[in-house]
Design a protein with these regions (language model features):
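Phosphate/dinucleotide-binding and metal-coordinating scaffold of catalytic cores
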Residues: 1-220
Length: 220
């Protein structure tokens, strides 16, 4: 709830979250989290064109273009967009691999996405080449990234915003001069415009008031 809210505040697509109590034949089954499905309706809220390919990364990096799950257009599967990205990474200039990807990846979106992953300590996301989604925006003809499976956030408050990256794109971002400069500028912008501690604490308190009675009931 808190983490996805921060992504949305920053303009990065992320599911909406709700809570519900479930009962079957009047037998209570407790409190559950409702996570918005990343469906065509979700894409319509964020994009003017929704016919692009939507991929899910699960312990696979973007260069493994045959292995990523395709969550849309399954009846007419075509991975040319992802294959082009993978080939561009293979051919990237060793001296400047980050900027050479600008024709295939929305660099602003990706930088914002990775910076937010570090801020909320989404250690199990693209940082580990896991739990991420990427959408090929037909309007810009570039890939955009957004979070997925963000259920282990804020676990290490001492986390380093320059932590090691397994993802080939995030390594190119953080470990090259031009990418690192862009990353630091984005981190500064997010800390000034999105990371509002009073607002975050207020959301936490609001959520606590909402679900605490039901958690107590579940534990009884």
């Amino acid at each position: 709830y808190i983490g996805y809210g921060l992504f949305r505040d920053a303009g990065v697509p992320a599911p909406r979250i709700g809570y519900a109590t479930v009962a079957v034949n009047q037998e209570p089954y407790g409190l559950y989290v409702q996570v918005e499905a990343v469906s065509s309706d979700f894409l319509k809220r964020w994009y003017s064109k929704t016919e692009g390919n939507l991929y899910e990364g699960s312990f696979r990096d973007v260069v493994e273009w045959r292995e990523l799950d395709l969550d849309s257009n399954q009846g007419r599967e075509n991975r040319r967009d992802l294959r082009r990205l993978a080939k561009s990474i293979e051919k990237a200039d060793d001296n400047n691999p980050w900027e050479s990807l600008a024709d295939y990846v929305d660099l602003g979106n990706f930088t914002r996405f990775i910076a937010l992953e570090q801020l909320v300590n989404h250690w199990d996301g693209y940082t580990q080449t896991n739990n991420y989604r990427m959408y090929y925006n037909p309007e810009t003809k570039k890939f955009e990234f957004f979070p997925h499976g963000a259920d282990q956030l804020f676990q290490d408050v001492r986390g380093n915003i320059f932590r090691d990256q397994r993802g080939i794109l995030s390594r190119a971002l953080i470990q090259t001069d031009s990418g690192n400069q862009r990353y630091c500028q984005m981190m500064k912008q997010l800390l000034e415009q999105v990371w509002d501690e009073s607002k975050i604490k207020s959301r936490i308190a609001e959520t606590y008031r909402l679900i605490h009675p039901y958690i107590v009931t579940d534990l009884e």
